[in-house]
């Protein structure tokens, strides 16, 4: 009981201390024109520092990450099948795969997976 309370207290205090230190250290830097401008050998920059980014590519990357995380969640499934109730595990897995399939069909119908347009 005491060990659990001590672990919980440490788990709460360490992030608070780190965030506090980051806040104190970050407040020391002051914003001015020279610090926020890109450095090009002392001359004024030739173009903006911002590069245009394709929102189509960004959306496709986010979809990939979401489906990749869902696949990673399916990885322990064979181990779970051997250790727990088979009916519950299969039912949960089929429900999870159906939600995945519905999401994929929605993205397909929406046109998010079409790279050419």
Curated annotation (Swiss-Prot):
Pfam family, one: Oxidored_q4
Membrane-spanning intervals of the chain: 5-25, 57-77, 86-106
UniProt entry tagged with the keyword Mitochondrion: yes
Principal EC category: translocase
GO MF, any single term: NADH dehydrogenase (ubiquinone) activity
Topology of this chain in the membrane: Multi-pass membrane protein
Signal peptide range: none
Predominant cellular place of this UniProt entry's protein: mitochondrion
Keywords for the protein's UniProt record, in alphabetical order: Electron transport, Membrane, Mitochondrion, NAD, Respiratory chain, Translocase, Transmembrane, Transmembrane helix, Transport, Ubiquinone
EC number, as in UniProt: 7.1.1.2
Localization of this protein: Mitochondrion membrane
CC per GO annotation: mitochondrial membrane; NADH dehydrogenase complex
UniProt catalytic activity: a ubiquinone + NADH + 5 H(+)(in) = a ubiquinol + NAD(+) + 4 H(+)(out)
Gene3D superfamilies in UniProt: NADH:ubiquinone/plastoquinone oxidoreductase, chain 3
Keyword Transport: yes
Summary of the function given for this chain in its UniProt record: Core subunit of the mitochondrial membrane respiratory chain NADH dehydrogenase (Complex I) that is believed to belong to the minimal assembly required for catalysis. Complex I functions in the transfer of electrons from NADH to the respiratory chain. The immediate electron acceptor for the enzyme is believed to be ubiquinone.
Family: Belongs to the complex I subunit 3 family.
PANTHER family assigned to the protein according to its UniProt record, in alphabetical order: NADH-UBIQUINONE OXIDOREDUCTASE CHAIN 3 (PTHR11058:SF9)
UniProt protein name: NADH-ubiquinone oxidoreductase chain 3
Gene that encodes it: ND3
């Amino acid at each position: 009981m005491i060990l659990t309370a001590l672990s919980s207290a440490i788990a709460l205090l360490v992030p608070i201390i780190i965030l506090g230190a980051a806040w104190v250290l970050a407040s020391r830097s002051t914003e001015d024109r020279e610090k926020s401008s890109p450095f090009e050998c002392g001359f004024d920059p030739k173009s903006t520092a911002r590069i245009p980014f394709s929102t189509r590519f960004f959306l496709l990357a986010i979809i990939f990450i979401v489906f990749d995380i869902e696949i990673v969640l399916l990885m322990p499934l064979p181990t779970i099948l051997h250790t727990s109730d088979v009916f519950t595990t299969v039912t949960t897995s089929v429900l999870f795969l159906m939600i995945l399939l519905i999401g994929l069909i929605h993205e397909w119908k929406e046109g998010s997976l079409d790279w050419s347009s």
